[in-house]
Amino acid sequence: MSVEKQTAMRRTFAIISHPDAGKTTLTEKLLLFGGAIQLAGTIKSRKAARHATSDWMELEKQRGISVTTSVMQFPYKDYLINLLDTPGHADFTEDTYRTLTAVDSALMVIDAAKGVEPRTIKLMEVCRLRHTPIITFINKMDRDTRPSIELLDEIESILRIHCAPVTWPIGMGKYFKGIYHLIEDAIYLYQPGKHERVGESERIEGINNPELDKKLGDLASELRNEIELVKGASHPFEREGYLKGELTPIFFGSAINNFGVGELLDAFVKEAPPPQGRETNSRLVKPEEEKFSGFVFKIQANMDPGHRDRIAFLRIASGQYQKGMKAYHVRLKKEIQINNALTFMASKRENAEEAWPGDIIGLHNHGTIQIGDTFTQGERFKFTGIPNFASELFRLVRLKDPLKQKALLKGLTQLSEEGATQLFRPLDSNELILGAVGLLQFDVVAYRLENEYNVKCVYESVNVVTARWVICDDKAVLERFNQEQSRNLAYDGGGHLTYLAPSRVNLEITMEKWPEIQFSETREH
């Protein structure tokens, strides 16, 4: 099959939401509908030993939150779907941000009782920057919820995106009876209790069908009136607005009850864009080009605790990957052979014989691959737009056992390569300073150091409030700066010079004193 045909059948997307909106449940139900898993394990179920397929790391299983991005591929009808499940927890914004550079569209999950929440707003801003098309699933309709019209108003006013309802709920909570599909003019009736298998919903054709009155009684005429109102007050779905990220089609349902998910998935594969072209520092790379290219957006250490492994997740941008092929590693300026790239179904992995644009493959990484690296078949371009953010919180890392210094350094180096934390090594001392965007990341690092590297550490406070990458083309100025400011300078994990400011005032004074130097909050990988 040609590159064009392989590309056309693929859909690569991420699921975004505020914690506890039901994102992991929906992820699992999509896999269920795609036939990738037979049984949905109820997440956070204390009695059952089953855990959600996408929360595979031990810490995630314990806490019931996703803290790393999982990659899952599954077929659905005539399509192949690459689903990236992003962390919903506030402290893992960077991982989520970088994941959104690797997808062509997003699925936003909203809790019908809570509406738009802070994380949703933040993630939406990222999608807007990239004009990512978004489909919205309003979840938990089987519980008591806010009025649906109110939810649409809130999405439009807070997230600044037009809403186009495709399905509309009939009742809510214990009176939830189903959904009306505005485009198909069909009603799907809700049957509670069909948790684990994909049940066929009873379907009634046409909103004016007398059968509806038999099933719903007075609710049927209420529904007809409500739909008239909804049609008058909302935007009709049009694909162009959706693809530009200006309009979001809205679906209602209950993920835990498998209800409304099939309609969502059908619309998604039909309307969501196939893999798109990608910008580099020299040109736009189109997916249908013959030559292979791709970029690394994530590194994950110890996916398989039995093997001390590090996997680099690479999004294929063009051409075809074939087992054993040679690829050019642009940053290192060298050709490498890729024999054993992986494909993923959460933590299940298989060796990939071939892969195409939109697919995510895993490369075994022995410390030579970094986030943002580009691989090509000889061309020397670099994919752009994969950011690193300055840390906001800092801790000094101390060992409980001084003999484990080597293991500590190895663990911190490998974990910081994943991009959720940053390791700083000051010019003036042998201290190890860990930087993060949120407090939870420090817990995660301490937990993983102990479980994966057998190293116990403690944190101490350190006199650093913010970090800035130091950029300067004038070598003489940079040398003078290094000498004068060495007590506040460190190298990050990638060997980039960083200014660790003891206070905001100090940073402002230093920036004024050194106008030739750029103090950057973000750095391209």
UniProtKB/Swiss-Prot annotation:
Any one of the GO BP annotations: regulation of translational termination
Short name of any one Pfam family annotated for the protein: RF3_C
Gene3D superfamilies reported in the protein's UniProt record: P-loop containing nucleotide triphosphate hydrolases (3.40.50.300), Peptide chain release factor 3, domain III (3.30.70.3280)
tr-type G domain location: 8-276
One GO cellular component, as annotated: cytosol
Disulfide bridges in this chain: none
CDD domains with a match to the protein in the record: RF3, RF3_II, RF3_III
Residues bound to GTP: 17-24, 85-89, 139-142
Subcellular location, principal: cytoplasm
SUPFAM superfamilies: EF-G C-terminal domain-like, P-loop containing nucleoside triphosphate hydrolases, Translation proteins
MF GO annotations: GTP binding; GTPase activity; guanosine tetraphosphate binding; translation release factor activity, codon nonspecific; translation release factor activity, codon specific
Keyword annotations of the record: Cytoplasm, GTP-binding, Nucleotide-binding, Protein biosynthesis
Compartments where located: Cytoplasm
Annotated family: Belongs to the TRAFAC class translation factor GTPase superfamily. Classic translation factor GTPase family. PrfC subfamily.
Protein purpose: Increases the formation of ribosomal termination complexes and stimulates activities of RF-1 and RF-2. It binds guanine nucleotides and has strong preference for UGA stop codons. It may interact directly with the ribosome. The stimulation of RF-1 and RF-2 is significantly reduced by GTP and GDP, but not by GMP.
Protein name: Peptide chain release factor 3
